[in-house]
Amino acid sequence: DASTSYYNPAGLSELRYSQLVLGAAYFKPKIKLFNAVATDRAGNPLTGNNPTEPKGRMFIPNGHVAWRVSRDFSLGFSVVEPFGVNTVYGNQDMARLMATRTRIRTLDFSPTFGYKVSKSFSIGAGLDFLRISTNIASVVGTTGGGGSEGGSYVINKGTGRAIGYHVG
């Protein structure tokens, strides 16, 4: 099907018709931390909810289209999210010192082509235009002494772009 444009663009030349393929996955992590221990700078245990279980869900879309230009030549285009994570811990959760929120999303936009050189040999290639965004938050700056907890809520955000290629 048309998703070959992302995984193996040479396979585009094997498609008999133009195609559109849409899909999605719903991801709800089920993670439990038991006996989580965190200490302040003086080594005193900090309090918090234990066991911890993060919340956070992700909808992961993908779409692929293939155009049969001729019997031996096809073009494709894919939009996929090859990597992502989304977890949320409460501000009073034991895991708050690691992260209260972690969200990383990547999108890959990929134009491709496939060409059938002979009956038993095809080539294909594609470009990958990637975009990544991240949002990571945590509680930091706990005080020392007697397990007292101060701290600030810190949010780190970032975005990036990259260009790559794949052949098959």
Model-identified regions with their sequence ranges:
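Residues that define the transmembrane beta-barrel architecture of outer-membrane proteins
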Residues: 3, 56-61, 105-109, 161-165
